[in-house]
């Protein structure tokens, strides 16, 4: 049996991040944690590109444009959707998540989805560190995995 071990070496990887500015204080803190973790994993600061959008519904279109540029090994979506008193929470959460997944599959690029969906600000604040750090690790690990699988695929074709 062949097993591919997880690889968290971010050296030489190019990572794109899209951050929703709605609930910006939480999102901005998530961005800081995510970038710090990427750097700890070896991703060079000049290899991290950050784009911001108004809200979670706009994240997929920005991700799609970053993915179509073919300049990135992985992408990260950062945002916060907090339940209100209307159905809008479900709509935004579901549509944003579906859009992120569609971009990943359509463009064959790993996307770490760090869009928090919580009942209140306190829950979101409690999850900043873990969710943002995990997103960085997921992006690096999955970028390395996809790159390795693509290399093996092309080697098999030769």
Swiss-Prot record:
Keywords for the protein's UniProt record, in alphabetical order: Riboflavin biosynthesis, Transferase
EC main group: transferase
Pfam families recorded: DMRL_synthase (PF00885)
GO biological process: riboflavin biosynthetic process
A GO MF term: 6,7-dimethyl-8-ribityllumazine synthase activity
Residues where 5-amino-6-(D-ribitylamino)uracil binds: 22, 56-58, 80-82, 113
Segment forming the signal sequence: none
EC number per UniProt: 2.5.1.78
Cellular component, GO, one term: riboflavin synthase complex
Active site positions, chain numbering: 88 (proton donor)
Annotated residues for binding of (2S)-2-hydroxy-3-oxobutyl phosphate: 85-86, 127
Domain of life: Bacteria
Reaction(s) the record says it catalyses: (2S)-2-hydroxy-3-oxobutyl phosphate + 5-amino-6-(D-ribitylamino)uracil = 6,7-dimethyl-8-(1-D-ribityl)lumazine + phosphate + 2 H2O + H(+)
Pathways involved: Cofactor biosynthesis; riboflavin biosynthesis; riboflavin from 2-hydroxy-3-oxobutyl phosphate and 5-amino-6-(D-ribitylamino)uracil: step 1/2
Cross-referenced SUPFAM superfamilies: Lumazine synthase
The family this protein is said to belong to: Belongs to the DMRL synthase family.
Function: Catalyzes the formation of 6,7-dimethyl-8-ribityllumazine by condensation of 5-amino-6-(D-ribitylamino)uracil with 3,4-dihydroxy-2-butanone 4-phosphate. This is the penultimate step in the biosynthesis of riboflavin.
Name of the molecule in the record: 6,7-dimethyl-8-ribityllumazine synthase
Organism listed in the record: Neisseria meningitidis serogroup C / serotype 2a (strain ATCC 700532 / DSM 15464 / FAM18)
Taxonomic classification: Bacteria, Pseudomonadati, Pseudomonadota, Betaproteobacteria, Neisseriales
Gene that produces this protein: ribH
């Amino acid at each position: 049996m062949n097993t591919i071990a997880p690889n968290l070496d971010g050296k030489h990887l190019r990572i794109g991040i899209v951050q929703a500015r709605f609930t910006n204080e939480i999102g901005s803190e998530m961005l800081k944690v995510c970038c710090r973790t990427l750097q700890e994993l070896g991703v060079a600061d000049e290899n991290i590109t950050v784009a911001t959008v108004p809200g979670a519904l706009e994240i997929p279109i920005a991700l799609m444009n970053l993915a179509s540029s073919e300049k990135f090994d992985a992408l990260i979506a950062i945002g916060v959707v907090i339940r209100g008193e209307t159905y809008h929470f479900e709509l935004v959460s579901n549509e944003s998540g579906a859009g992120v997944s569609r971009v990943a599959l359509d463009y064959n690029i790993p996307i770490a989805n760090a869009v928090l969906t919580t009942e209140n600000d306190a829950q979101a604040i409690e999850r900043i560190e873990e969710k943002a750090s995990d997103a960085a690790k997921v992006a690096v690990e999955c970028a390395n995995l996809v790159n390795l699988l693509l290399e093996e695929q092309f080697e098999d074709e030769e």
